[in-house]
């Protein structure tokens, strides 16, 4: 028996009749299931205990042998082996068919494999198999051809004329005979000859046939095994029959389907024994064929067999297919024990790494641990009494629970889990009540709020699982977002508002200009009401404990506010004292202007200065990033907790809230609207005179009203008091934005109608004034569309993520360096003059491919294969270097993954990526997760007309599926000059003059040109506005151009929406789309022309023949969309669990495919550890060389302990 958990590969193939019989424990002869009186299985029926094993452990059918001591005995009365009942899950039976039947997958799939092997059309096959025509199996010495079809009438005529010199037959028997007669080697050689000359349709047909025949030849499958003589019967526990209350039975549909097969098979046997007329026998054989078809794949041919209530029965194929099928429901998504779920509430007093677990839930989850501990401490005599104690919830149980929970992390998960931060580990603390408490800072990562969200808890059981949870998944470790390397645990809402209020400055506040000897004195003054948080004061710099002050500065006074003194106490000592929200203050030191000599006139100096802006959400984010960069995880999580506490404390103290009086209506509003209305009337006048078209009129009216709204918005923002609560909320980034404010106090502006077209009648009222009935009605369109869109697009985005994960799931960092000599030349991504992604953003965390020198001094800025850090990237960007050649996933040579150097830095940790990191899945999540963000953005504005995300998600799908884009651009196929632009009838033509030839391009009606006569153009560049079709681009240029184009386009969509994604994630995805080539000429290799091969398979095949001095094959790169690419993967398990399950499995079985289990999904399906992270072989197969005892050199601050 193979070791269930450890095998190298998994192979699938066709089963021969002998193989099926060898699996079987006996023949099922009767259609009966169980006896309705005794409720015991009928003998020889579908649940027979003699075939499938006993129903009760260690007990035979008749009851002669009971108990374990008879293990292995076969009862002499009823013939049942005494064993465990669970063998009923694994023992199979079989049905001996009275006539061969065809397997519908191989006959009916597209392309029909049976048809390709026999070179017959599927229609002809169908006629033969379902007894409509005869087929000639032996022509003898008659003018008939082998495989020729004859109708009943023709057959009789030929029979009369030629007697028995030829043979013709019907049904699967005939097909079986033809399949047995095929000589594979002869056919293959014949087809290879034909390929040398054939063209067009004949060529494609020959290639298809060759592929199938080669598959049969190489896999050891016999073509005749596509016809079944024996039908396997799956174990009864996999098609159970259960008694419902009320004595009725519920049974799996498979039992009905099997029963029909057995009934028809038995009837056929009887008819054959009786020697019935052939027409009756044929009809029965056809019905048997249809019954077997329905069992294997119901509904594939003709009308599906239905059960009660006209519901189609679920056949074997349906058991595998779709979200509810075996693959996705049971193999890829299992339900697990030791888990619970509950509503979440906020836990503001928790530490970063803690969560609150309700007591009763914890008791249930940690039950086995508590029981063990109770017994060990002698509080219970045995496990049974311990269990009873817990069930009665006796008081001593709680103390034991406390000790068990210590140091035992739990995982919290919130659905939908869009990226890896959707599951994090926390140390549980017991809380009263029945709600889970969640730390407020991790809400962003989970996208959780406390309006009734629920979360699931899982307990990692083994010590390895606990260690991984603690070291890799603890919330305090996950500070950076894997998609862009920016902190994901930035404070939000109240916390932002509190810190904003704390760092405000106010001219002329109480006690302005006071001087204090240290921070404590200032605090004392604040607590006693002599100064306010916002008061600008001076403090002796020496007393502010800060390592970045120079000796000279320490003898001076520091100008700051009481609030900023409090704020700076949460930062590490060697961090600059932050006095203003600028990068120089953050990264270097406190600006010199805040230090004054002792004895200067403080009040004058302060009065002469402007107020410094307070710290908004963005600045807090930068502070966190900077602290993380310098002090790593431990210090950052401590600071975050302190920042959270400050935020909550001071937003409470500030008492900032919104009242109607805070919304002041703009006085000049009527005037502005009046002007706009006059302009609109003017435009309408011009339209009526016929000076402008309907389109122009519409566009102008829209733009007039948009401008009016912008003017109102600008004036509103200017007229606002900086202390206005709503302004403070939006300025700090806590909640709301300028657009909300404009709608409250200015005007709601233009709205879109249900089809998305902007209605030219604007809503002139604001919410403060109140809307008219018509205005309100117009508003409802947009609001409703927003909600409907959200619901639909969330599903779209989820499906996109699923496809992305599927195509990249086997991309894992597999080695340190692949040794490639190629790189990717990168510069800033621009759209017109606007920089979409700067060179700095693209360089950080990558390895340089070639040495980068300063353009003027020639000084080496980056050496070859050196990591580019933030500082180096700044130097490179400022030196005026335009492009840099870097290592990239695009050019990596590693098989089934990437290497450390080509990938660069792991964005989630800020350190080099480790071997074993599942970068493919991280890339998929990083691209898919913001997809949902984009999706949900339309929802918040309440449908105010603006840029909807229609470019967003659909465009991303278009790019990754490599579809022909909407509004496709015409591209030039040659380098040259635009010779002329001619008008022809109703369209234009562009003539490109190259060195050798000129090309003329017809420009579609309504397309906008991007070129002018005399302009130089290179191949692959657009002649008109629009998106390029990447497949076209690949034909005209090379892989590099396509890779760069796709990367640029994806980044454009996301950056326009304000979402940042690391380039490397897009690179990983695009690489997966371009990993196949199509063989155009096979040379002297074994590959077939026209087949899709992995680049590595192709180079291997060529290397093999080149060594023998033969002719290599040629191929062109192919761009596959992600769905297609997932289905083309080498792993049939992964492809089958993705989509088109039956097609993938049919193909794999005929080719006798081996799944080498390299990706993650395949291993999850068969229940092995995934080969990523600590599951990689290089980490599992570790031998102990010697044991030594040494002191651990770990400094205290490296281990996160908080007393």
From Swiss-Prot:
Enzyme class: transferase
Catalytic reactions of this protein: RNA(n) + a ribonucleoside 5'-triphosphate = RNA(n+1) + diphosphate
Cofactor(s) this protein requires: Mg(2+); Zn(2+)
Protein source organism: Bacillus thuringiensis (strain Al Hakam)
Similarity section: Belongs to the RNA polymerase beta' chain family.
Highest taxon listed in the record's lineage: Bacteria
Assembly description: The RNAP catalytic core consists of 2 alpha, 1 beta, 1 beta' and 1 omega subunit. When a sigma factor is associated with the core the holoenzyme is formed, which can initiate transcription.
GO cellular component: DNA-directed RNA polymerase complex
Name recorded for this polypeptide: DNA-directed RNA polymerase subunit beta'
Primary gene name: rpoC
UniProt cross-references to InterPro entries, sorted A to Z: DNA-dir_RpoC_beta_prime, DNA-dir_RpoC_beta_prime_bact, RNA_pol_asu, RNA_pol_N, RNA_pol_Rpb1_1, RNA_pol_Rpb1_3, RNA_pol_Rpb1_3_sf, RNA_pol_Rpb1_4
Cofactor note: Binds 1 Mg(2+) ion per subunit.
Keywords in alphabetical order: DNA-directed RNA polymerase, Magnesium, Metal-binding, Nucleotidyltransferase, Transcription, Transferase, Zinc
EC number: 2.7.7.6
